[in-house]
């Protein structure tokens, strides 16, 4: 499974390099919309700069005469992409961990132990059949403390999705209401309140905005921090290998 590459533009909070300290060629690239984050020393005595453009990490390299800058990847003699490593280490991985903290702080429907080997956040729609299948598949893992699941309900698949989501969240025991709904294949409907509390409406809207910010275009959208502390993403029903990785938190 590939490491999830998050939309980083909203998460880069550290100060960026001041334009006045940049060589003229790098300043010209900055004027084209590349945000320069920090300098770094590249192999071979080459000066490099780390940046981002529209949420994607980029590396720039200054020629020895200081008159030209090259945007792209640097490889070593063994074919290793050295640029990709610094982009991952300095941008994607820290941004992923920052996003994971946000996901952990969000209210949701929790199932399983806080001591489980792998903590999982899943965005789900009440009318999503793949979400239901995933919920059923992970129940044994939840029961044996391999996983804990926090479900963030969204309302995107049907006009009544939001109504069902808010009714489940408004229940006296949202976790039980969700479990009953999923276990019954959606036949055990939640009790619908006369009106949706504003806080629940805002929560569902926030869930949807967060899912979109993460780049997910469908449900279930599954996230977890693996044993290497890398944020992982699965969109849709996990295949056999993805389920094995999830169960092992790798």
Task: Mark where each language-model region is.
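C-terminal low-complexity, charged extensions that often adopt amphipathic alpha-helices
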Residues: 93-98, 142
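Positively charged n-region of N-terminal signal peptides that target proteins for export
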Residues: 1-5
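Structural alpha/beta surface segment adjacent to cysteine/selenocysteine redox centers
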Residues: 116-126, 132-196, 212-217, 237-238, ...
């Amino acid at each position: 499974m590939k490491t999830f590459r998050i939309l980083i533009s909203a998460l880069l909070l550290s100060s960026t390099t001041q334009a006045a300290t940049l060589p003229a060629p790098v300043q010209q690239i900055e004027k084209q919309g590349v945000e320069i984050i920090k300098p770094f020393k590249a192999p071979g005595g080459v000066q490099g700069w780390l940046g981002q453009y529209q949420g994607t990490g980029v590396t720039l390299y200054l020629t020895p005469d200081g008159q030209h800058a090259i945007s792209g990847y640097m490889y070593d003699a063994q074919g290793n992409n050295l640029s990709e490593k610094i982009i991952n280490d300095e941008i994607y991985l820290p941004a992923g961990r920052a996003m994971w903290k946000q996901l952990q702080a969000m209210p949701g429907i929790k199932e399983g132990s806080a001591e489980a080997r792998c903590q999982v956040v899943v965005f789900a729609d009440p009318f999503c059949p793949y979400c239901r299948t995933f919920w059923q598949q992970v129940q044994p893992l939840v029961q044996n403390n391999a996983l804990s699941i926090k479900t963030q309900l969204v309302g995107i698949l049907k006009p009544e999705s939001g109504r069902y989501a808010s009714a489940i969240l408004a229940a006296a025991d949202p976790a039980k209401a969700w479990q009953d709904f999923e276990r019954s294949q959606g036949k055990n409907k939640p009790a619908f309140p006369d009106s949706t509390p504003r806080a629940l409406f805002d929560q569902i809207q926030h869930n949807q905005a967060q899912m979109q910010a993460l780049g997910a275009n469908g449900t279930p959208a599954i996230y977890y921090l693996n044993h290497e502390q890398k944020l992982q993403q699965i969109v849709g029903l996990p295949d056999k290998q993805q389920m094995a990785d999830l169960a092992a938190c790798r």
